[in-house]
Design a protein with these regions (language model features):
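Outer-membrane beta-barrel translocator/channel fold
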Residues: 2, 35-38
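Face-selective signature of the C-terminal outer-membrane beta-barrel domain
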Residues: 16-34, 56-209
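Outer-membrane beta-barrel translocator/receptor signature
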Residues: 1-13, 19-23
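Non-catalytic, glycine-rich low-complexity segments
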Residues: 52-54
Length: 210
């Protein structure tokens, strides 16, 4: 007997509020979940073996953005965001023997999971001194949490032997930040200039990278 199961789901949603003549608020989200698995069951006389194999992954993003008009020439966007990614896969095998003294079940399973969690904030400014000159500048800070991967192994041979252990690297935390500025200007009808700068840094377990 074979029982496949699958599920694919994606959701995009966005709502916005007008708080006044100069302020708007936007809330957006993306939710994705894909799940696939197969279960089998076989009977051989007094023995029954069952196999369960599956994998799933999830993406989730939530963002809140505030748009503010400081003046006719200056606008800003402040964004707060949170995201999540998960990946899981597993294999589970069990063998059951029917005996006069009762059922005896042996089991072997291997489960693996990994993931990433992000939370951060960003601010961007758009400044337009005139219709031939456009300046952008801002910055961003994001906190990352990495789950590099963990494997759980389960061995169950009744009273003879049992094992349930998890193997994997520890979680890793890092902070990423950057600031930028960009200046775009029309010098004349034939020439245009676009100059700017970007500085970024990464903090990982007490070490700084720039």
């Amino acid at each position: 007997q074979v029982d496949p199961a699958y599920f694919f789901h994606d959701l995009n949603a966005k709502v916005n509020w007008r708080l006044g003549d100069r302020d708007r608020l936007y809330l957006s989200t993306f939710q994705g979940l894909d799940d696939f698995g197969v279960k089998t069951r076989s009977e051989y006389g007094s023995s029954i073996d069952e196999i369960d194999v599956g994998l799933d992954w999830r993406n989730s993003v939530l963002a809140l953005r505030w748009n503010h008009e400081h003046s006719a020439n200056l606008f800003s966007n402040v964004t707060l965001m949170k995201s999540r990614y998960d990946f899981n896969t597993g294999f589970d095998f069990s063998l059951t023997d029917e005996t006069p003294d009762g059922d005896i079940t042996e089991r072997f399973a291997s489960l693996y999971n990994s993931g990433i969690r992000d939370i951060g904030g960003r601010i961007d400014f758009d400044y337009t001194p005139n219709n031939r000159h456009f300046v952008r500048f801002g910055g961003n800070v994001t906190r990352h949490q990495f789950y590099p991967g963990a494997t759980q192994v389960i061995l169950d041979y009744g009273d003879d032997f049992n094992l349930d252990t998890t193997l994997g690297a520890p979680d890793l935390f890092s902070t990423e930040a950057f600031i930028y500025v960009e200046d775009e200007i029309d010098l004349n009808e034939r020439w245009k200039a676009n100059v700017g700068g970007h500085f970024s840094t990464l903090f990982v377990e007490g070490v700084t990278y720039t």
